[in-house]
Curated annotation (Swiss-Prot):
Catalyzes the last two sequential reactions in the de novo biosynthetic pathway for UDP-N-acetylglucosamine (UDP-GlcNAc). The C-terminal domain catalyzes the transfer of acetyl group from acetyl coenzyme A to glucosamine-1-phosphate (GlcN-1-P) to produce N-acetylglucosamine-1-phosphate (GlcNAc-1-P), which is converted into UDP-GlcNAc by the transfer of uridine 5-monophosphate (from uridine 5-triphosphate), a reaction catalyzed by the N-terminal domain. The gene is glmU. InterPro entries: Bifunctional_GlmU, GlmU-like, GlmU_C_LbH, Hexapep, Hexapep_transf_CS, NTP_transferase_dom, Nucleotide-diphossugar_trans, Trimer_LpxA-like_sf. This is Bifunctional protein GlmU. The active site is at H362. In the N-terminal section; belongs to the N-acetylglucosamine-1-phosphate uridyltransferase family. In the C-terminal section; belongs to the transferase hexapeptide repeat family. Residues 230-250 are annotated as: Linker. PANTHER family: BIFUNCTIONAL PROTEIN GLMU, NUCLEOTIDYL TRANSFERASE. One of its GO terms (molecular function) is glucosamine-1-phosphate N-acetyltransferase activity. Pathway: Nucleotide-sugar biosynthesis; UDP-N-acetyl-alpha-D-glucosamine biosynthesis; N-acetyl-alpha-D-glucosamine 1-phosphate from alpha-D-glucosamine 6-phosphate (route II): step 2/2; Nucleotide-sugar biosynthesis; UDP-N-acetyl-alpha-D-glucosamine biosynthesis; UDP-N-acetyl-alpha-D-glucosamine from N-acetyl-alpha-D-glucosamine 1-phosphate: step 1/1; Bacterial outer membrane biogenesis; LPS lipid A biosynthesis. It catalyses: alpha-D-glucosamine 1-phosphate + acetyl-CoA = N-acetyl-alpha-D-glucosamine 1-phosphate + CoA + H(+); N-acetyl-alpha-D-glucosamine 1-phosphate + UTP + H(+) = UDP-N-acetyl-alpha-D-glucosamine + diphosphate. It holds the Pfam family Hexapep. Its main location: cytoplasm. Gene3D superfamilies: Hexapeptide repeat proteins (2.160.10.10), Spore Coat Polysaccharide Biosynthesis Protein SpsA, Chain A (3.90.550.10).
Length: 461
């Protein structure tokens, strides 16, 4: 049986009070509509069609290559939105699942189960339902004695008996495709909002003698629709719990999973430990047996095995195996830390490669530089790379030693086995085995203390 998915993503979402269109708000690193498309892909459909309206070009940019698109010119209800896909689907055999782009928590498993139930039951329409702990505000599912759906009763229209039902409409449906578009052409807009409702299709099909059923999914939380910032935070919390639990099932330890924020595309190896208040975002990959301490923030970075990150920030950076950093250090874009290197506290590295077993201990800035292996960079060293107009590069060879407080003014090359004395300002190349000293000579002034202002009118021994 052919399968199609229609995702409704034309609404602006005024309750979000945002310039960003509702379905483009992110949950754990992906837009809401991307989460829905990802779940849809898990059903191996023949077509995914996203109905766009407000912010159409922005939504198309996000979903480029993942979906076909239909355009809803005016937002005249869910029935009108599905009808916008008429030209792409009308005459096709198969089943069509309809979902909304603001429900990011639905899983591929749930969508697959809905397709399966729909096809096995021989329904023309199947409603995805759930048991709600508090069904207030939801449409209630009213079934007949055989379990078929008679109608969906909205909160404002229900009798006390109907409102006592806790099975609710999640807003996701599966239809016989041809019957869907035949029924949509019969939907009217004789209601207070003047809109065309997709739910009216159920009554049209039932009256035509078609079977309308339901599939009750076990996890009500999947059905959460996001209409405001409160619901966005709730969806993020639920998604985050899922992500962290999946990592834990795969061998990752979380000291406090409730406070660790991990984006959905992050990969983490087994035996890695994540402390609380850690943020890991984007396409970050972390190897096995790593330790990430509290208050670390890692974005779009690649981390090898046996790496320790202590309360530090990494952005578009790379740390190879057996390296460590922190506390309170910062790897900026294109920072590469090679195997065995040590980055200490209060170090900033930008667009620089730190070679194997090199140590950059503390209070240092390394920018636009290539450092070889087995180098020691002393405390307070500055790689001065910018003249106010251009950035310049520095090279430091293997087995070199840079003393504390040195300033390396690029462009300059320091050869293998070179030595830079502490507090030197280096402006010229340093050759192999040479030591560079560039600082003023010390001069001692005998008995000068008594000439200083602080010594006047005071008794000093």
């Amino acid at each position: 049986m052919n399968k199609y998915v229609v995702i409704l993503a034309a609404g602006k979402g005024t309750r979000m009070k945002s310039k960003l269109y509702k379905v483009l708000h992110k949950v754990c690193g992906k837009t809401m509509v991307e989460h829905v498309v990802e779940a849809a892909k898990g059903t191996n459909p023949d077509k995914i069609i996203t109905v766009v309206g407000n912010g159409a070009e922005s939504v198309k940019d996000v979903l480029a290559g993942q979906s076909e698109f239909a355009f809803q010119e005016k937002q005249l209800g869910t029935g009108d939105a599905v009808l916008a896909a008429n030209d792409l689907l009308e005459n096709l055999e198969g089943s069509t699942l309809v979902a909304t782009g603001d429900t990011p928590l639905f899983t591929a498993e749930t969508f697959n189960n809905l397709f399966k139930k729909h096809e096995e039951s021989g329904n023309s329409a199947t409603v995805l339902t759930a048991k709600a702990p508090n069904p207030f505000g939801y449409g209630r599912i009213i079934r007949d004695e055989d379990g078929n759906v008679l109608r969906i009763v909205e909160q404002k229209d229900g009798t006390p008996e109907e409102l006592a039902v806790d099975e609710i409409n999640t807003g996701v449906f599966c239809f016989d495709n041809k019957e869907l578009f035949k029924a949509l052409k019969q939907v009217g807009n004789d209601n207070a909002q003047g809109e065309y409702y997709l739910t009216d299709v159920l009554e049209i099909m039932r009256k035509a003698g078609h079977k309308v059923g339901a599939y009750e999914m076990p996890d009500f939380s999947e059905s959460l629709g996001v209409n405001d910032r409160i619901a966005l935070a709730q969806a993020t919390k639920i998604m985050q719990r899922r992500i962290n639990e999946e990592h834990m099932r795969n061998g990752v330890s979380f000291i406090d999973p409730d406070t660790a924020y991990i984006d959905s595309d992050v990969k983490i190896g087994n035996d890695t430990v994540i402390e609380g208040n850690v943020v890991i975002k984007g396409k970050t990959e972390i190897g096995s047996n790593c330790y990430i301490t509290n208050s670390s923030r890692i974005i779009d970075s690649k981390i090898g095995n046996n790496v320790t990150i202590t309360s530090s920030t990494l952005q578009e950076a790379q740390m190879d195996d057996n390296t460590d950093i922190g506390p309170n250090s910062h790897l900026r874009p294109k920072a590469v830390i090679r195997k065995g290197a040590h980055i200490g506290n209060f170090v900033e590295i930008k667009k620089a490669e730190i070679g194997e077993n090199t140590k950059v201990g503390h209070l240092t800035y390394v920018g636009d530089a290539t450092l070889g292996k087995d180098i020691n960079i002393g405390c307070g060293t500055i790689f001065s790379n910018y003249d106010g107009v251009k950035k310049f590069h520095t090279n430091v060879g293997d087995h070199s030693f840079i003393g504390a407080g040195a300033t390396i003014i690029a462009p300059v090359n320091i050869a293998d086995h070179a030595f830079v004395a502490a507090d030197s300002t280096i402006t010229k190349d340093v050759e192999k085995y040479d030591m560079a000293i560039a600082r003023g000579r010390q001069t001692n002034k005998p008995d000068y203390w008594h000439k200083l202002p602080l010594a006047k009118d005071k008794e000093w021994e």
